[in-house]
């Protein structure tokens, strides 16, 4: 008798995706982050669902409903902090996953890469609208500042902002629609993730060498299921440590003050995972220019496959490209630090230099070094 997992229409799909999937034998722990992102998504949807049962998307009760969740609901504080810190873990895994793709040339699978960029944008949108929901000071002012950036669009900007707000300022209508967006977007992310996997399984996984590994494949189960379980345990351990010992480490104290349109916080800043983009936005003194730089800082990922000049796919055997890659990582960490600092000397100039270096590395230096490496190898 043939195994049910190979004949049943539904089981067959799962079998081909997670059990009998031929996988390169040499993929390292950097390939764990895809499954960890799936785990993060499931955790966020589940904790979010339980939070939504007790939350009220209304300006007069939103803040107190979050306080009620933390004080009166059984393990409400735990669910709330799992959800908040789960978002941070999500972005850590996301950035590691993208970094892996950049380093090993996984972006050459263009459909998978483009769906991935779309996923990144959707997750960022979800995190942004979610941050508004507790209706603290930073929620309110973050929403005001970021949505107001759209007013930089010529001609239709102001109308567009008022349309998104549902009035002339961030108010009840804004909170209600942001809650609706925050509820629906994770399901759109789930659908996109399925398409992402579909395209990946058309080509098969890349590997650290960047060389086709069709002659050296092993089944996904048990080899990589056990490896993914180890990664999942480490992720859960880190998340639990963060949630139970320092739940507010990555949050902003201003968000424990109820939203007040009459009182602006001294330093308006987003959550840590948006700080690099926020630093790029602030480094340009022109509003429209800043918005364009902010957009380009993320959308530049779409152009990465077109900027590939090296004859080698992976950076594994390219020491000069490796140097530039780690310079880019250091630059992004610098931008993240600058985004959290006030707008004053010397942070302004450091932010501007780091922003220039970011675009220079991706658009000019890395493609140039790829060509130089080809010459050195006489290719």
From Swiss-Prot:
Species: Sotalia fluviatilis
The name this protein goes by in its record: Cytochrome b
GO cellular component: a single term: respiratory chain complex III
Binding site for heme b b562: 83, 182
Subcellular location as annotated: Mitochondrion inner membrane
Gene that this polypeptide is encoded by: MT-CYB
Positions that bind a ubiquinone: 201
SUPFAM superfamilies: a domain/subunit of cytochrome bc1 complex (Ubiquinol-cytochrome c reductase) (SSF81648), Transmembrane di-heme cytochromes (SSF81342)
GO molecular function: metal ion binding; ubiquinol-cytochrome-c reductase activity
Family to which this protein belongs: Belongs to the cytochrome b family.
Cofactor note: Binds 2 heme b groups non-covalently.
Domain of life: Eukaryota
Functional description taken from the UniProt entry: Component of the ubiquinol-cytochrome c reductase complex (complex III or cytochrome b-c1 complex) that is part of the mitochondrial respiratory chain. The b-c1 complex mediates electron transfer from ubiquinol to cytochrome c. Contributes to the generation of a proton gradient across the mitochondrial membrane that is then used for ATP synthesis.
Transmembrane segments: 33-53, 77-98, 113-133, 178-198, 226-246, 288-308, 320-340, 347-367
């Amino acid at each position: 008798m043939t195994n049910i997992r190979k004949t049943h229409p539904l089981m067959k799909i799962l079998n081909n995706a997670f059990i009998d999937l031929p996988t390169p034998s040499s993929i390292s722990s950097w390939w764990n982050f895809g499954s960890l992102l799936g785990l993060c998504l499931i955790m966020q949807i589940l904790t979010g669902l339980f939070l939504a049962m007790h939350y009220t998307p209304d300006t007069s009760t939103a803040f107190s409903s979050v306080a009620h969740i933390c004080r009166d609901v059984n393990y409400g504080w735990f669910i709330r902090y799992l959800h908040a810190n789960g978002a941070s873990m999500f972005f850590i895994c996301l950035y590691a996953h993208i970094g892996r793709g950049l380093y090993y040339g996984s972006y050459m699978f263009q459909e998978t890469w483009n769906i991935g960029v779309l996923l990144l944008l959707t997750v960022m949108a979800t995190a942004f609208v979610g941050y508004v929901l507790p209706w603290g000071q930073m929620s309110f002012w973050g929403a005001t500042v970021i949505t107001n950036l759209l007013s930089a669009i010529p001609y239709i900007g102001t109308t567009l902002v008022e349309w998104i707000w549902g009035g002339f300022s961030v108010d009840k209508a804004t909170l209600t629609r942001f809650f609706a967006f925050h509820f629906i977007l994770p399901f759109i992310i789930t659908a996109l993730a399925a398409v992402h996997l579909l395209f990946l399984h058309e080509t098969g996984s890349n590997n650290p060498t960047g060389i086709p590994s069709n002659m050296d494949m092993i089944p996904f189960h048990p080899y990589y299921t056990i490896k993914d379980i180890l990664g999942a345990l480490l992720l859960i351990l880190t998340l639990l440590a963060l949630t139970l010992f320092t739940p507010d480490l990555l949050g902003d104290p201003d968000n424990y003050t109820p939203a007040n349109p009459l009182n602006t916080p001294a330093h308006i800043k987003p959550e840590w995972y948006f700080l690099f983009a926020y630093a790029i936005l602030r480094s340009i003194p022109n509003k429209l220019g800043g918005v364009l730089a902010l957009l380009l800082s993320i959308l530049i990922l779409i152009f990465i496959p077109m900027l590939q000049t090296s004859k080698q796919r992976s950076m594994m055997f390219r020491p000069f490209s490796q140097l530039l890659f780690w310079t880019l990582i250091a630059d992004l960490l610098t931008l993240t630090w600058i985004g959290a600092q006030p707008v004053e000397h010397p942070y302004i100039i450091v932010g501007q230099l780091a922003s220039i270096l970011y675009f220079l590395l991706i658009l000019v230096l890395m493609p140039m070094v790829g060509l130089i490496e080809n010459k050195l190898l006489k290719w």
